[in-house]
């Protein structure tokens, strides 16, 4: 409470966002519009692993749950998602749900040309978006 009051004394401050410090496996979901195919949805490990491992799975929107699970299971890093060496896996159902919901959103928000949600922090209980980037093109 003291720190909140102190921060609110700063003239330019109009509000403060407070969120819990979370831990988990970093995941990634994204999308890119391709002229010939429509929206391509991507998933994989997130954070720096997207660039380092280049282990990404893709599918054409809209996606079914079966297709989302297939994307997840086809990743080379799937053992990390499943849980390995004593580490618990992530909630695959929630990860698949996010992939499906993103693909559904793209059917209706056609102005979205690129989208990255990276990282998603995932545990066996939750999958929560930490950061996102969206590029929109209006016609």
Describe the residue ranges of each PLM region:
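ATP-dependent carboxylate/acyl-activation modules
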Residues: 1-139
């Amino acid at each position: 409470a003291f720190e909140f009051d102190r921060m609110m004394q700063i003239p330019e401050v109009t509000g403060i966002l407070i969120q819990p410090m979370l831990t988990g496996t970093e995941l990634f979901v994204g999308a890119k519009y391709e002229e010939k195919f429509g929206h391509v949805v991507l998933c994989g490990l997130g954070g720096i692993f997207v660039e380092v491992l280049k282990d990404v799975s893709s599918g054409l929107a809209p996606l079914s749950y079966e297709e989302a699970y297939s994307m997840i299971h086809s990743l080379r890093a799937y053992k990390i998602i499943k849980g390995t060496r004593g580490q618990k896996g992530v909630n695959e159902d929630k990860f698949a749900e996010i992939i499906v919901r993103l693909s559904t959103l793209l059917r209706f928000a056609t102005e979205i040309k690129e989208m990255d949600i990276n990282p998603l922090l995932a545990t066996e209980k939750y999958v929560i978006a930490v950061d996102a980037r969206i590029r929109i093109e209006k016609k």
